[in-house]
């Protein structure tokens, strides 16, 4: 009887390799621990941290190739971008940048990686095929973030000090095509897939501002009251520092860095409407979504953790400890792992 059960178990594991103990992780969250030297890797099916990838001191940004075969990490201390093979978690290439690299983004065709160079006010453009910086673009003082929505024709980069977001045509020699001016220093940004709306976090604002890209003009601000002093994060150094569009472009989620929550807005009408706030860990300063939009993940810098949130139920499901001062994070589905499912 025992032999029969063992044989049946073996058959099940062979027919479904995803059940095997050593099966590749099919859904993985990479978390950049900005005050440390590592990326934390979380198995999203098991909802637990499984390993630490040593990457270099002060990893800043993360971006993934369209096919999820490579994740790119900017490392401030080395002034470099590292290419990580997601099937093996090995660094397969390193490209030196022209200065201190901040957040980066990949063009939808996978050909180019743009990196905001904070100390020079530029954006480096890496040719992924040649693995080198092929062009450097003017952005403005304290260049900080780059962003390209899925299927878009442009890349966007921010200058904190100039209060601007610049739009570049990556298919036309990376030409500057628009500059959008805001009324305060610009932090993170996100753009709808149709490139109609641009949303930004601004210093001093507990909420967000938005612009219409057809005109290149800021349309307004949306602000939520600050929490009472006793409920504010002691770690947070600004009101918000992270925002992202839930897949489907119907909801905008904004971190309440100071209020330990994720603020949700309905953007299907103008002006956007506040919906609710989901409580997460201390000082959430970045967030991202699963590709299907079912889950949100916040990086809680004050708690050295991430929170998994059920987007439809507006409920935090689990906190998972990671490294020191987590910030950027990215869900990845390694191609080899997908092939085994």
PLM region spans:
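Bacterial N-terminal signal peptides that target proteins for export
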Residues: 1-7
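Predominantly soluble domains enriched in secretory-pathway, periplasmic, or organellar proteins
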Residues: 10-341
């Amino acid at each position: 009887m025992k032999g029969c059960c063992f044989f049946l178990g073996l058959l099940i594991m062979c027919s479904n390799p995803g059940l095997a103990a050593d099966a590749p992780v099919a859904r993985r969250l990479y978390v950049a621990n900005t005050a440390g030297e590592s990326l934390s890797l979380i198995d999203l099916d098991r909802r637990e941290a499984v390993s630490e990838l040593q990457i270099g001191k002060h990893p800043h940004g993360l971006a993934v190739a369209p096919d999820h075969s490579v994740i790119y990490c900017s490392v401030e201390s080395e002034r470099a971008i590292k290419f990580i093979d997601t099937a093996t978690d090995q660094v397969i290439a390193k490209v030196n940048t022209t200065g201190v690299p901040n957040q980066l983004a990949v063009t939808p065709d996978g050909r180019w990686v743009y990196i905001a160079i904070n100390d020079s006010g530029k954006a480096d453009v890496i040719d992924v095929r040649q693995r080198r910086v092929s062009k450097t673009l003017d952005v403005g003082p304290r260049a900080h973030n780059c962003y390209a929505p899925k299927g878009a024709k442009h890349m966007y980069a921010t200058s904190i000090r100039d209060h601007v977001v610049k739009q570049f045509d990556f298919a036309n020699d990376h030409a500057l095509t628009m500059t959008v001016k805001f009324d305060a220093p610009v932090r993170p940004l996100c753009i709808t897939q149709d490139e109609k709306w641009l949303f930004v976090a601004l210093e001093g604002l507990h909420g967000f501002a938005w612009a219409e890209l057809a005109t290149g003009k800021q349309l307004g601000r949306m602000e939520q009251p600050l929490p009472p002093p006793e409920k504010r994060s002691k770690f947070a150094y600004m009101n918000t520092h992270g925002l992202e569009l839930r897949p489907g472009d119907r909801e905008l989620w904004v971190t309440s860095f100071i209020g330990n929550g994720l603020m949700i807005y309905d953007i299907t009408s103008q002006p956007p409407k506040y919906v609710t706030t989901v409580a997460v860990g201390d000082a959430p300063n970045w967030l991202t979504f699963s590709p299907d939009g079912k889950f949100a993940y916040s990086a809680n810098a004050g708690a050295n953790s991430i929170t998994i949130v059920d987007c439809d139920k507006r409920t935090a499901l689990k906190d998972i400890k990671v490294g020191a001062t987590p910030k950027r994070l990215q869900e990845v589905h390694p191609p080899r792992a997908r092939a085994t499912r």
